């Protein structure tokens, strides 16, 4: 493009019936076998990478950065419908709960309401 932004043609918000369909989910995790921050990150990294690759969602470690056995990760999802967002949230939660090196202590979900 003339203004130097290569993605200007594709830029935009996914909308259906005037609404943006998006949600965020956070996971409070316990890493019982961790004895160092390095060990904790080694246990969390496959979860974060797996979520990105399998579900194509945005994910980050968001809390407990300095604690050896605690972690919080958050996932953000934008999709074409609330149903699709819910399906992805369900899959993401199952994926995290099945991770062998962690215990899932709790989850919290927030939906974006926008028109």
PLM features per residue range, with description:
Residues 2-5, 10-15:
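N-terminal amphipathic/hydrophobic targeting modules at extreme N-termini
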Residues 14-58, 95, 99:
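N-terminal first-folded block
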Residues 78-115:
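C-terminal structural segments of small proteins and small subunits
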Residues 6, 55-62, 103-110:
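Short beta-strand elements
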Residues 25-29, 73-75, 107-109:
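A structural signal for short, well-ordered beta-strand segments
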Residues 59-81:
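Short, charge-patterned binding micro-sites
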Residues 21-23, 71, 103:
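A generic structural signal for well-ordered coil/turn residues at beta-strand boundaries
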Residues 28, 62-64, 91:
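A general secondary-structure boundary signal
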């Amino acid at each position: 493009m003339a203004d130097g932004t290569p993605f200007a043609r594709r830029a935009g918000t996914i909308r259906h019936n005037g609404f943006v369909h998006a949600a965020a989910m956070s996971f409070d995790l316990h890493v019982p076998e961790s004895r160092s921050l390095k060990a904790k990150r080694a246990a969390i990294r496959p979860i974060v990478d797996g979520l990105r690759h399998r579900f194509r969602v945005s994910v980050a470690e968001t809390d407990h950065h300095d604690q050896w056995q605690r972690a919080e990760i958050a996932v953000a999802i934008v999709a074409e419908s609330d149903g699709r967002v819910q399906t992805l949230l369900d899959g993401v939660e199952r994926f995290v709960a099945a991770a062998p090196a962690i215990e899932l202590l709790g989850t919290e979900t927030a939906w974006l309401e926008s028109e």
